[in-house]
Curated annotation (Swiss-Prot):
Residues 1-11 have a biased composition (Polar residues). GO terms for molecular function: DNA-binding transcription factor activity. Keywords: Repressor, Transcription, Transcription regulation. This is Protein SPEAR2. PANTHER family: OS01G0212500 PROTEIN, PROTEIN SPEAR2.
Length: 300
């Protein structure tokens, strides 16, 4: 520091020296006021320049190889996904890259492996051996606790049972009978379908025929060689409708029988001897042709 000591008994030369010394102190103070950047800013700028001019990650020197067969080394999930999500032009600083654990990344390791249950099921279905630990892959069977059973055994048993069912189903004969089957001798238990034309067939003396081509009175079921296919109604009638149809058919049969007994030309005498006892009508008094049996006085 400069000290300004003013003395009253000083000469002119002393005052001049005092002015020079005070001027030199002022120059030194100006030099001390020069500001400098701290060391942190320079280092950050240097790192930024290195990142800009550094080649991408793909052309960087190969990473150190690690034994792939060692099952205890697993890359943390966060570091793997960080490496995948970063852009190819991005590169880690030298200080950060030295602290992070580095593992070789392959295409197969980026895809998450399937669960143990699913992998074993696919391998059993396709008859493929279990995948062996190869280069770039980690395969380790997770053994269940002692108080639990492994799910692989149950899956294999289930698949064996399914294969047995499929094999027996192939050997089983066709369950349905076709039209070209051999005749079977013995009482049949086929259900007959009652149709509206059944009563009409009975009145005409025709026995109803079942679907298999056999009559209901014959206990031996023999397929008829000339079976005519019938057109069945589209809708099966209900109980009340069926009774009404039966009643209509019955009335129709009665009317047909009554008409068959009555002569068509009622005005022609039938020639029965019972008609001789009847009284003579007034129209017969004027004359009639008894020889031919036709009434000539008939007025239409």
């Amino acid at each position: 520091m400069c000290s300004n000591n003013n003395t009253s008994s000083g000469s002119y030369g002393e005052l001049q020296l005092h002015d020079e010394s005070s001027g030199s102190c002022r120059k030194k103070q100006k030099k001390d006021k020069v500001r400098r950047r701290g060391p942190g800013v320079a280092e950050l700028e240097k790192i930024r320049l290195q990142e800009e001019y550094k080649p991408p990650l793909s052309s960087s020197p190969s990473l150190p190889n690690i034994d792939h067969h060692h099952h205890t080394l697993f890359a943390p999930a966060s570091s793997v996904y960080d490496l995948v999500m970063t852009s190819p032009n991005f590169s880690f600083p030298e200080k950060l890259a030295s602290t992070l654990p580095v593992f070789p990344i392959s295409y197969g390791s980026l895809i998450p492996p399937a669960p143990i249950f699913q992998r074993s099921q696919h391998s059993l279905m396709m008859n493929l051996p279990n995948p062996s630990p190869g280069a770039g892959r980690f395969y380790q069977f997770i053994e269940p606790p002692s108080n639990q059973r492994s799910c692989v055994d149950s899956v294999s048993q289930f698949l064996e049972e399914e294969n047995k069912k499929i094999f027996t189903a192939k050997k089983r004969p066709w369950p349905f009978l076709t039209d070209t089957t051999k005749p079977s001798v013995g009482p049949t238990t086929t259900s007959t379908i009652i149709r509206p034309d059944a009563t009409q067939n009975r009145s005409m003396g025709i026995t109803p025929v079942q679907e298999t081509g056999t009559t209901t009175s014959n206990p031996i079921a023999i397929d008829s060689p000339t079976s005519i296919p019938r057109h069945y109604p589209r809708f099966i009638p209900l109980g009340l409708q069926y009774e009404q149809q039966q009643q209509k058919l019955k009335d129709l049969d009665e009317t047909m029988q009554w008409r068959s007994k009555k002569p068509f030309y009622s005005f022609i005498p039938s020639g029965d001897p019972s008609n001789d006892d009847q009284e003579q009508r007034p129209c017969d008094l004027f004359g009639s042709a008894a020889d031919h049996g036709i009434d000539l006085n008939l007025k239409l």
